[in-house]
Amino acid sequence: MGRITVWDEINFGGYATEFTDSVHNLSAESGRGPVVGSENWNDQISSWRVVTGQWQFFEHAGYGGVATKVYGPGECLNCAQAGFSNKWISSIRKISD
């Protein structure tokens, strides 16, 4: 089963959550937001760790807009190091387990 952990701050800081399936709209992840009063993870991710599988990030909901390359097991301490902005991701696609 594919698994990815995301954080709302760089260097695995702040709040974290885990996904095991694609999320076509991070705004719909109600109750999983990084701070009290935050309803979702849309435009909140700043670092991540791919535990298993292959994953791809998208600028807009529904896997729209700019797409990143596909990432396999490994980690990114700062989205800017991967070539895109922090707090930019609006959907996540699991490519494989």
Residue spans for each PLM region:
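Compact beta-sheet-dominated domain cores in extracellular/mature segments
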Residues: 1-97
